């Protein structure tokens, strides 16, 4: 069995705390549905530390948000955050990609964009289905929430998560185009 390194455990703890606290803030766009900039944390930490870290940060962080907010833990949405974090972490497994070393190409960015978008859609549909089947929520309400949450998460991913991750990778490049003059 693979053990989690101390570095990975610390990253999961920090990421979960950030995602959990930042998840308390957002802009309402539908019933119980918000644009939450915290989603960018899942993108960045997933890209830095991989799918397991992304999964655990999503699960733990969302549980923290729901607990602090006092509205009860909505497990379908907690699991959906884990799914999103997990899919954001797929990029870290690509050969040649490293945010830490600043190594990436256009194909890597496209891969992150595609896996991120697919992960968001799958996760939100899962959360909606869970709410209807397990929680007994009305179908009409959930359709609005699923559409709103999907749009909100895609916006945050494309406007914050992806650009921040690319920016971090660019800032960590090990080479420069500057030339040493003799």
Swiss-Prot record:
Topology class, membrane: Multi-pass membrane protein
Gene Ontology cellular component list: plasma membrane
Organism superkingdom: Bacteria
Protein localization: Cell membrane
Main subcellular localisation: membrane
Sections of the chain in a coiled coil: none
Presence of the UniProt keyword Nucleotide-binding in the record: no
Pfam families: ECF-ribofla_trS
Transmembrane segments: 9-29, 40-60, 71-91, 114-134, 142-162
Key words of the record: Cell membrane, Membrane, Transmembrane, Transmembrane helix
Matches recorded under PANTHER family: UPF0397 PROTEIN BC_2624-RELATED (PTHR37815), UPF0397 PROTEIN SPR0429 (PTHR37815:SF3)
UniProt record similarity statement: Belongs to the UPF0397 family.
Protein name: UPF0397 protein BT9727_2423
Organism: Bacillus thuringiensis subsp. konkukian (strain 97-27)
Record lineage: Bacteria, Bacillati, Bacillota, Bacilli, Bacillales
């Amino acid at each position: 069995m693979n053990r989690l390194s101390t570095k990975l455990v610390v990253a999961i703890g920090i990421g979960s705390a950030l995602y959990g606290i930042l998840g308390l803030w957002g802009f309402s766009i539908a019933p119980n549905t918000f644009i939450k900039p915290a989603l960018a944390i899942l993108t960045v930490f997933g890209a830095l530390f991989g799918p397991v870290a992304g999964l655990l940060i999503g699960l733990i962080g969302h549980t923290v948000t729901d607990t602090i907010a006092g509205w009860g833990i909505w497990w379908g949405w907690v699991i959906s955050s884990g799914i999103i974090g997990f899919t954001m972490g797929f990029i870290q497994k690509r050969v040649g990609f490293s945010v830490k070393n600043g190594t990436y190409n256009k194909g890597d960015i496209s891969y992150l964009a595609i896996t991120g978008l697919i992960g968001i859609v799958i996760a939100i549909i899962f959360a909606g289905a869970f709410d209807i089947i397990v929680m007994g929520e009305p179908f009409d309400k959930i359709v609005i929430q699923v559409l709103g949450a999907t749009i909100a998460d895609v916006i945050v991913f494309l406007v914050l998560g992806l650009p921040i991750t690319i920016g971090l990778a660019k800032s960590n490049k090990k080479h420069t185009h500057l030339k040493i003059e003799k």
